[in-house]
């Protein structure tokens, strides 16, 4: 996430904005698709630092991690843009902040997906929560939730026995603008397909799919968002 304040006299009359689309969640046991960064440029189709007013991160958003019988890592946080990544970072006040990592899936020995606390990384967005894990005994577990804080509500995880994770939401009210990621899907241990992870809202991460004989698909990552205001 990047925030900038630039005197208008230092900017051209026309800017070109490319907003990154969220990466797709993968099917069972597969890795998701990485989401590209967002750019503000002084020339169309140019992303080199000498053309850029702003760039959202040092690298494209990491793809969601593929689940296995033993691993359950969450997706990595969005990277911090560097001062040299865009010449426009030196035109005014500039702050870059890392995103929030996704929650881990439930353990291979069985367990609920890891919940994500909204606002826990100091940004008004969130990673996606982890999907539930199921053991060889086929016990079902719920997906992780997005735990609300302040004015932001809790988004519950998918119920045990193949419940789908809930989609992330966007709040736009005075005095709050915020989004969150999707919650995790519940497991389907003995048969069937586990719950799908919830899709994310702007700038946030998709929820992890639940584990099972056939794991649930991961949720889609949120699209980027560029807001430009002048006064």
Can you say where each PLM-predicted feature lies in the sequence?
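Intrinsically disordered, low-complexity regions enriched in glycine and serine
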Residues: 129-131, 183, 206-211
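Composition-driven low-complexity repeats that form or flank extended alpha-helical/coiled-coil segments
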Residues: 154-157
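Secretome/extracellular-domain signature
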Residues: 1-152
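Membrane-topology and secretion signals of cell-surface/extracellular proteins
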Residues: 164-166, 186-195
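Short, structured beta-strand segments at or near domain termini in extracellular proteins/domains
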Residues: 220-231
């Amino acid at each position: 996430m990047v925030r900038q304040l630039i005197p208008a006299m230092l900017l051209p009359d026309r800017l070109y904005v490319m907003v990154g689309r969220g990466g797709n969640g993968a099917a069972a046991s597969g890795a998701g698709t990485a989401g590209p960064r967002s750019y503000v440029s002084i020339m169309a189709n140019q992303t080199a630092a000498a053309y850029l007013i702003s760039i959202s991160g040092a690298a494209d958003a990491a793809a969601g991690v593929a689940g296995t019988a033993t691993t359950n890592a969450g997706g990595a946080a969005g990277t911090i843009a560097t001062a040299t990544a865009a010449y426009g970072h030196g035109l005014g006040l500039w702050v870059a902040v890392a995103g929030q990592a996704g929650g881990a899936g439930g353990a291979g020995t069985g367990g609920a997906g890891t919940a994500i606390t909204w606002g826990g990384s100091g940004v008004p967005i969130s990673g996606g929560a982890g999907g539930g894990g199921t053991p060889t005994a086929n016990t079902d577990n719920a997906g992780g939730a997005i735990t609300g804080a302040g004015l932001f509500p809790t988004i519950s995880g998918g119920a045990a026995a193949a419940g789908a994770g809930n989609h992330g939401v966007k709040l736009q009210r005075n005095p709050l603008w915020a989004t969150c990621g999707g919650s995790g899907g519940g497991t389907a241990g003995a048969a069937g397909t586990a719950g799908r992870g919830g899709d994310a809202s702007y700038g946030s991460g998709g929820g992890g799919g639940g584990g099972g004989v056939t794991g649930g698909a991961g949720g889609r990552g949120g699209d980027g968002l560029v807001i430009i205001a002048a006064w």
